[in-house]
């Protein structure tokens, strides 16, 4: 599995400012997701099977805030986060185009199990996670890969992703100011915080590049 990990992406002062923004009573809006905070569970049928239905122990209700996406969504709070996007670009070896940028807030639900394995999109893309604070709730990566050249159509790929068995490959611990970039076809899953940690906030990014960012030299 190829990935890029960057420590101390932002200055400590700016990181603290962003974290205070999303955790305080200062008007920053969070939007409740009653199904699962990992991805949308609407639609996606394969025969009589709802492709994105998931076991109860893999569901994780939570909150989200979309800062930017392909559908034209641009949050009025985006300007506060543009320095993060600039820093991500500066940390990578080639130009990128951001497709979606969203914040996810997960709560301690008492469960130790990871959430549903998934990819953010069936299309070619890169994905990244930026952690705003130290907490429990590892991001789990699996050996399984959604190969776009497998010969399966999109519905078949989704069905395979929902029904196949998964073997754990790597865990990434949420640590303040850490960026973790990976192939968007790699199956992964979030975990809710546990123990003394009551919440977990991470920035999720999806982007394109004309170059192979793992082959290019930084």
Regions found by a protein language model. Name each.
Residues 74-218:
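Catalytic core of non-heme Fe(II) oxygenases with the double-stranded beta-helix
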Residues 1-95:
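Non-heme Fe(II)/2-oxoglutarate
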């Amino acid at each position: 599995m190829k990935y890029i990990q960057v420590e101390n992406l932002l200055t400590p002062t700016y990181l603290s400012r962003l974290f205070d923004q999303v955790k305080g009573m200062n008007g920053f809006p969070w939007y409740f997701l009653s199904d699962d905070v990992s991805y949308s569970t609407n639609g996606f049928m394969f025969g009589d099977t709802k492709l994105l239905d998931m076991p109860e122990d893999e569901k994780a209700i939570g909150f989200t805030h979309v800062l930017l996406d392909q559908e034209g969504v641009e949050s009025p709070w985006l300007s506060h986060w543009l320095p993060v996007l600039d820093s991500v670009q500066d940390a990578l070896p080639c130009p990128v185009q951001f497709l979606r940028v969203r914040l996810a807030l997960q709560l301690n639900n008492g469960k130790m199990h990871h959430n549903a394995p998934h990819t953010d999109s069936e299309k070619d893309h890169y994905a990244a996670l930026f952690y705003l604070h130290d907490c429990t709730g590892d991001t789990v990566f699996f050996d399984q890969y959604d190969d776009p050249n497998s010969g399966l159509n999109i519905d078949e790929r989704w069905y395979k992703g929902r029904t196949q068995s998964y073997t754990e490959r790597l865990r990434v611990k949420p640590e303040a100011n850490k960026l973790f970039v990976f192939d968007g076809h790699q199956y992964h899953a979030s975990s809710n915080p546990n123990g003394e940690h009551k919440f977990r906030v991470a920035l999720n990014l999806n982007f394109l590049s004309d170059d192979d960012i793992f082959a290019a030299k930084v």
